[in-house]
């Protein structure tokens, strides 16, 4: 089953 797209992950500092 295809998973729903996840929100973009912000770059770590």
Curated annotation (Swiss-Prot):
Residues bearing the modification Pyrrolidone carboxylic acid: 1
GO biological process, one term: regulation of blood pressure
A GO MF term: toxin activity
A GO cellular-component term linked to this record: extracellular region
Keywords annotated in UniProt: Hypotensive agent, Metalloenzyme inhibitor, Metalloprotease inhibitor, Protease inhibitor, Pyrrolidone carboxylic acid, Secreted, Toxin
UniProt keyword Secreted present: yes
Major localisation: secreted
Superkingdom, natural source: Eukaryota
Location(s) in or outside the cell: Secreted
Keyword Secreted in record: yes
Tissue expression profile of the protein: Expressed by the venom gland.
Function: This peptide both inhibits the activity of the angiotensin-converting enzyme (ACE) and enhances the action of bradykinin by inhibiting the peptidases that inactivate it. It acts as an indirect hypotensive agent.
Recorded family membership: Belongs to the bradykinin-potentiating peptide family.
Record-given protein name: Bradykinin-potentiating peptide AP
Phylogenetic lineage: Eukaryota, Metazoa, Chordata, Craniata, Vertebrata
């Amino acid at each position: 089953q295809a998973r729903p797209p996840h929100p973009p992950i912000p770059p770590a500092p």
